[in-house]
Amino acid sequence: MSHYIELTEENFESTIKKGVALVDFWAPWCGPCKMLSPVIDELASEYEGKAKICKVNTDEQEELSAKFGIRSIPTLLFTKDGEVVHQLVGVQTKVALKEQLNKLLG
């Protein structure tokens, strides 16, 4: 089973600059984030080689969170070739996340 990519200020830009990525902004104390975590793990496995499934710990990456204006968590950013193209806030279904990823992978 594939694992998501943990993003930091150091690897964020280089990781998302090419292709499609889903970036989950989360925190360890966040109940809804914990509910979403297994879905993120499943997507990382299902989309291996097609899209990057990533997570940003907002407690550890405050500057990165501020850069993207993250005010509520979980916040999910969908990127294509380094540009944010869609954003969802709150717990989402796996179906909704797959739908958005598949649209971007087109």
Swiss-Prot record:
<dbReference type="GO" id="GO:0045454">
    <property type="term" value="P:cell redox homeostasis"/>
</dbReference>
<comment type="function">
    <text>Participates in various redox reactions through the reversible oxidation of its active center dithiol to a disulfide and catalyzes dithiol-disulfide exchange reactions.</text>
</comment>
<dbReference type="InterPro" id="IPR036249">
    <property type="entry name" value="Thioredoxin-like_sf"/>
</dbReference>
<keyword id="KW-0249">Electron transport</keyword>
<feature type="domain" description="Thioredoxin">
    <location>
        <begin position="2"/>
        <end position="106"/>
    </location>
</feature>
<dbReference type="Pfam" id="PF00085">
    <property type="entry name" value="Thioredoxin"/>
</dbReference>
<keyword id="KW-0813">Transport</keyword>
<dbReference type="InterPro" id="IPR005746">
    <property type="entry name" value="Thioredoxin"/>
</dbReference>
<comment type="similarity">
    <text>Belongs to the thioredoxin family.</text>
</comment>
<keyword id="KW-0676">Redox-active center</keyword>
<keyword id="KW-1015">Disulfide bond</keyword>
<dbReference type="GO" id="GO:0015035">
    <property type="term" value="F:protein-disulfide reductase activity"/>
</dbReference>
<dbReference type="InterPro" id="IPR017937">
    <property type="entry name" value="Thioredoxin_CS"/>
</dbReference>
<dbReference type="InterPro" id="IPR013766">
    <property type="entry name" value="Thioredoxin_domain"/>
</dbReference>
<protein>
    <recommendedName>
        <fullName>Thioredoxin</fullName>
    </recommendedName>
</protein>
<feature type="disulfide bond" description="Redox-active">
    <location>
        <begin position="30"/>
        <end position="33"/>
    </location>
</feature>
